[in-house]
């Protein structure tokens, strides 16, 4: 069983060029379509072991040739103007086949006119192409103000004396089914592009047609890939190290928080429970073993009473050396008071010695001026160290007056 189906494909830029030429013209436009027709047979085997062959024809519209003057290659009756037709298609190569023609009409319906049908039949006979297609494009105003127009297009193909519409697909970059490799021939290349490529071909291509710089570019690409792999490995290692450091930092923060919380709890406990004077407790047990009242007394190191009695043993090794007498330097407050007293006494003693040295000098001067025979004058000036300055001066005056008195 065999079947046939036909579809048409037109690239987006070809369709855009067609519409641009039409919308920038003040009247109807027409021209020819160039491209190729490819047939592909698909054989599918069914469960009944019968071959089902389907032939798919694809019309690839690759280029258009506009006629800048309406009805240039035909007359009113639809007869062809052969010389003008040859001029229009003279610049086209043999590889570029004429697969159809097109026409734009303003403010009309999507229906082929009788003259278009006759013209299409004459073109089929002249071009010897029974599969010639006709692309009809019409534009109609979509609003009452005619500010927006609606463009309609349809591809017509004659079959058994009737024109049937062929599905036309406008390929676009956004279409997912157009991302693969094309099995059809490429678009028609312009003459200017061919001339430019031939002129500069030797600069970029070898004699065998391969690019001259492909090997260098491939080597550079390989080197870049190696460098990229090294950089990626270094990046992975650095990310791992950063992750480990972050984990260590978080662990340290957690430990610090736990330690801080523990210190706060222990600090509160210490502040709530003052430290006991263990030595005093053991001394009371040693010297008053029969007194329950003294053994139940608990004092802190600061001298404050602890409400709860002590029943535990403190396990002090030097229990025999304990005594109830406390040395003065063992008490910090007493040691501070004693140091203050010693400092004040040293200052007072210094002032006293200075005054005594001055008084001794005065006494020496008076003793030199007076009579040295008397026993009282030979007596040195001695102080016990407890006399005041007034007592010393009084004794000095008494000695001086005694030395000046006459002796009988």
From Swiss-Prot:
Coiled coil, from the record:
210-273
Q: Name one GO biological process term.
A: mitotic G2 DNA damage checkpoint signaling
Q: Which InterPro entries match?
A: BRISC_Abraxas1 (IPR023239), FAM175 (IPR023238), MPN (IPR037518)
Residue spans of biased composition, Polar residues class: 360-372
Question: Looking at the record's lineage, which domain of life comes first?
Answer: Eukaryota
Q: Write out the annotated subcellular location.
A: Nucleus
Which PROSITE patterns does the entry mention?
MPN (PS50249)
- Motif pSXXF motif in this chain: 405-408
Using the record's annotation, list all stretches that form the MPN domain: 7-155
Q: According to its UniProt record, how is this protein modified after translation?
A: Phosphorylation of Ser-405 of the pSXXF motif by ATM or ATR constitutes a specific recognition motif for the BRCT domain of BRCA1.
Q: According to the UniProt entry, which residues carry Phosphoserine? A: 405
Q: Where is this region: Disordered?
A: 360-408
The record's comment on protein family reads: Belongs to the FAM175 family. Abraxas subfamily.
Q: What does this protein do?
A: Involved in DNA damage response and double-strand break (DSB) repair. Component of the BRCA1-A complex, acting as a central scaffold protein that assembles the various components of the complex and mediates the recruitment of brca1. The BRCA1-A complex specifically recognizes 'Lys-63'-linked ubiquitinated histones H2A and H2AX at DNA lesion sites, leading to target the brca1-bard1 heterodimer to sites of DNA damage at DSBs. This complex also possesses deubiquitinase activity that specifically removes 'Lys-63'-linked ubiquitin on histones H2A and H2AX.
Name recorded for this polypeptide: BRCA1-A complex subunit Abraxas 1
To which species is this protein native? Xenopus tropicalis
The protein's gene is named abraxas1
């Amino acid at each position: 069983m065999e079947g046939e189906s036909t579809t048409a494909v037109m690239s987006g830029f070809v369709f855009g060029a067609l519409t641009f030429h039409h919308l920038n013209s003040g009247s109807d436009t027409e021209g020819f379509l160039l491209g190729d027709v490819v047939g592909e047979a698909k054989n599918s085997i069914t469960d009944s072991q019968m071959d089902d062959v389907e032939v798919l024809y694809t019309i690839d519209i690759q280029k258009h040739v506009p006629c800048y003057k309406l009805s240039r290659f035909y007359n009113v009756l639809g007869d062809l103007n052969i010389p003008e037709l040859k001029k229009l298609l003279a610049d086209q190569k043999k590889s570029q086949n004429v697969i159809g023609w097109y026409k734009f009409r303003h403010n009309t319906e999507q229906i082929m006119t009788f003259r278009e049908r006759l013209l299409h039949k004459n073109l089929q006979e002249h071009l010897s192409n029974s599969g010639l297609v006709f692309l009809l494009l019409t534009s109609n105003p979509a609003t009452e103000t005619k500010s927006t127009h609606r463009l309609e297009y349809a591809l017509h193909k004659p079959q058994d004396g009737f024109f049937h519409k062929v599905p036309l697909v406008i390929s676009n970059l956004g279409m997912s089914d157009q991302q693969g490799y094309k099995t059809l021939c490429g678009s028609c290349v312009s003459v200017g592009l061919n001339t430019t490529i031939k002129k500069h071909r030797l600069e970029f291509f070898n004699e065998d047609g391969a690019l001259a710089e492909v090997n260098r570019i491939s080597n550079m690409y390989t080197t870049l890939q190696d460098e990229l792999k090294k950089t990626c490995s270094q990046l992975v290692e650095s990310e791992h190290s950063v992750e480990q450091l972050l984990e260590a930092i978080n662990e340290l923060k957690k430990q610090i928080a736990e330690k801080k919380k523990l210190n706060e709890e222990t600090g509160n406990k210490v502040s709530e429970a003052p430290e006991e004077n263990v030595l005093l407790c053991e001394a009371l047990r040693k010297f008053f073993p029969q007194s329950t009242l003294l053994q139940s007394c608990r004092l802190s190191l600061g001298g404050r009473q602890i409400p709860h009695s002590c029943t535990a043993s403190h396990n002090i090794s030097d229990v025999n050396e304990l005594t109830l007498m406390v040395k003065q330097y063992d008490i910090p407050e007493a040691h501070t008071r004693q140091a203050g007293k010693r400092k004040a006494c040293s200052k007072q003693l210094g002032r006293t010695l200075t005054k005594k040295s001055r008084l001794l000098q005065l006494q020496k001067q008076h003793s030199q001026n007076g009579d040295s025979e008397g026993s009282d004058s030979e007596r040195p000036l001695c102080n016990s160290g407890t006399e005041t300055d007034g007592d010393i001066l009084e004794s000095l005056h008494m000695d001086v007056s005694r030395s000046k008195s006459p002796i009988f």
